[in-house]
Amino acid sequence: MSALLMLCAVLLLLGTPSRGARPWEPCTDLRPLDILAEVVPLNGATSGIRMVQVEGVRGLQFSATEPRTTSFPASRIFSSCDFFPEEFSIIVTLRVPNLPPKKNEYLLSLLAEERDTLLLGLRYSPTQLHFLFLSEDLAGAWQTRVSFWSPGLMDSRWHTLILAVSQGSFSLTTDCGLPVDIMADVSFPPTLSVRGARFFIGSRKRTKGLFTGVIRQLVLLPGSDATPQLCPSRNARLAELSIPQVLKRLTGKPDDNEVLNYPYEADMKVTLGSRPPCTKAEGAQFWFDAAQKGLYLCAGSEWVSVLAAKTKLDYVEEHQSLHTNSETLGIEVFSIPGVGLFAAAANRKARSAIYKWTDGKFVSYQNIATHQAQSWRHFTIGKKIFLAVANFGPNERGQEFSVIYKWSPRKLKFTLYQRIATHSARDWEAFEVDGEHFLVVANHREGDNHNIDSMVYRWNPSSQLFEANQSIATSGAYDWEFFTVGPYSFLVVANTFNGTSTQVHSHLYIWLVGAFQLFQSFLTFGAADWEVFHIGERIFLAVANSHSYDVQMQAQNDSYVLSSVIYELNITAQTFVKFQDIPTCSALDWEFFSVGEDHFLVVANSFDGNTFSVNSIIYRWQGYEGFVAVHKLPTFGCRDWEAFNTTAGSYLIYSSAKEPLSRVLKLRTG
Ligand SMILES: *[C@@H]1O[C@H](CO)[C@@H](O)[C@H](O)[C@H]1NC(C)=O
Ligand SMILES: *[C@@H]1O[C@H](CO)[C@@H](O)[C@H](O)[C@H]1NC(C)=O
Ligand SMILES: *[C@@H]1O[C@H](CO)[C@@H](O)[C@H](O)[C@H]1NC(C)=O
Ligand SMILES: *[C@@H]1O[C@H](CO)[C@@H](O)[C@H](O)[C@H]1NC(C)=O
Ligand SMILES: *[C@@H]1O[C@H](CO)[C@@H](O)[C@H](O)[C@H]1NC(C)=O
């Protein structure tokens, strides 16, 4: 009681900006709020909910038919105002089966339905319990995820979890054991508005990710940590704060021996400092690695990670505004061993610039004359280092060619190596097949004709030059991407326009007996980029669709806001199948990157039909949910994204096709 009063006093003193000068008052009752009881009718009978009894203990199971039947408006418990408490705990008693890998299930979600935004969520995967919440600041809205390593949860036995949240401190207590604390550098927001929001129990509104286990207790305790109220408990796995009336009767008697045998962790030893030895004598002891924030258990003779010391992406911060010679259509980041990290910018006007990473910033290093340069490609052949530029425009004498430059280790500059005749070149791709080196150019158009050949060139080791090897018919080719799957080599082209329509097929080719042959075609809409990436064993191909336009149907169908598509390779069927549609605004580029064990895609959104000021979006891989938007970045005519690492951390750089300004962003990891 007195602790609660003190808390109220503290909240009173701090106040919160958006609640104005009004005295602080809690938005809800400060007693335990039985969220589960809100969705259970008193007689226990409703479609979508079933009562089951396991180990002599009653719980509820939800069915996939209608997540809405297990939801209720937040206003039902937020009776006096609309703010989620800044400090609270959530108490859950549940019994969950083993989940297949990659599967995730929601225990609870709070959704702002109009915006379809997850305000708060609790979900678990085979090894982790994730607490998600929305934080908003001037830079945009963020979904933050705090993850607890909890592989012991999925053993088909009852467990009681207490998640206590207070600003940046997140603490999880399992079965009244030792709490695991995570200090995050993103705090739970002091003013999370729940106006118009809805609680969903056992789902996040969709049938996908529906909770398949049994739930007995789900309580929100505003204002305080429930642990002292529940623990220690004689029956820690079923410690109870509040459960719905219908679940109250325990028919079977819990096995007393089981309770007594439960390993209380009271005499658990945690060692700090550098890695201590782990032998039989240290068995079952813990070591906390303070530097990496990892908690390890000595099991047998090895330290086993309990609370994983992993890096995760928290947010991005602006690192450098890079003022460029002119608008930048493409950026290529590469390193030269022993020299450093470079970024080549393809600039629209007469000169393109190469920057070198110096004292944590890109600094101008070399300028090269180019003609409406569209992109650069870095590649190596043996010890030789090359950089090829795709020139879109002709030179002063009306000649059209693109140029390969070679790094001179003596001059420490790139020098002209070979000119190749091209037609409004958009992109170069470099690759190796069976030990031979190739380049392929995307010829966009010749005069007004977009239906022309693009060309594959082979490196001739005797002449030490690239020579034409295969021509491939393309329609307004914009981008080539090479990748391999096992022993097979693939090349995919983004075809933009065939003279009358942007709704054309982009083609994927496979290398068979010395040449590329058609493997699969995809209907694309002004395709500007293909990005290939792997997540574990899975292989994905994402296309950036920039424009839907057709001369014949101009009026009905001239749109920049359309879906870009992610395909996944089905190895059995030997074909890429649609995996996910993502709405984009004239998407020009996809970039895939990883931070720790998390995977992300960022899209260059460039135009919505009216303005070039559109947000580019970072998506996070969330397993069965696919890619989920986690961050918006205001961009202007965004054209190209690149991810790179230095010893100081991970970065993204993006260019603008509409202003002479590129930006370097640093990925904040925790
Ligand atoms: C371009 O594509 C459209 C739609 O696919 C098709 O109707 C039209 O005939 C094509 N035009 C040419 C010149 O291939
Ligand atoms: C292209 O290169 C491959 C690999 O060296 C070779 O087998 C093939 O004959 C070449 N084709 C042409 C037309 O030069
Ligand atoms: C208009 O474009 C969309 C793709 O953005 C496509 O799905 C639809 O079929 C097109 N409609 C017509 C009439 O071509
Ligand atoms: C892959 O294709 C095979 C054969 O068409 C099909 O049976 C299987 O369900 C597909 N796998 C996935 C994951 O879609
Ligand atoms: C950067 O480093 C991370 C490891 O933290 C790695 O997963 C990622 O692939 C690297 N990215 C690039 C672009 O090299």
Swiss-Prot record:
Task performed by this protein: Plays a critical role in tooth and hair follicle morphogenesis through regulation of the Notch signaling pathway. May play a role in development or function of the auditory system.
Record localization: Secreted; Cell surface; Cell projection, Stereocilium
Lineage: Eukaryota, Metazoa, Chordata, Craniata, Vertebrata
Protein's UniProt keywords contain Nucleotidyltransferase: no
BP term (GO), one: regulation of Notch signaling pathway
Residues linked to a glycan: 498
InterPro entries linked to this entry: ConA-like_dom_sf, EAR, EPTP, TSPN-like_N
Domain Laminin G-like: 59-278
Tissue specificity comment: In the organ of Corti, expression at postnatal day 1 (P1) is restricted to the basal region of the stereocilia of inner and outer hair cells (at protein level). Expressed in the organ of Corti at P1 and P7, in cochlear ganglion, stria vascularis and vestibular ends at P7, and in inferior colliculus, remaining brainstem, cerebellum, brain hemispheres and retina at P1, P7 and in the adult. Also detected in adult liver, lung, kidney, intestine and testis but not in heart or skeletal muscle.
Keyword Cell inner membrane: no
Gene3D superfamilies: 2.60.120.200
SUPFAM superfamilies registered for this protein in UniProt: Concanavalin A-like lectins/glucanases
GO cellular component terms given for this protein: cell surface; ciliary membrane; extracellular region; stereocilium
Residue windows of the EAR repeats: 314-359, 361-409, 413-461, 465-513, 515-571, 575-623, 626-669
Name under which the protein is recorded: Thrombospondin-type laminin G domain and EAR repeat-containing protein
Cleaved signal peptide residues: 1-20
Superkingdom, natural source: Eukaryota
A matching Pfam family: EPTP
Keyword annotations: Cell projection, Glycoprotein, Hearing, Repeat, Secreted, Signal
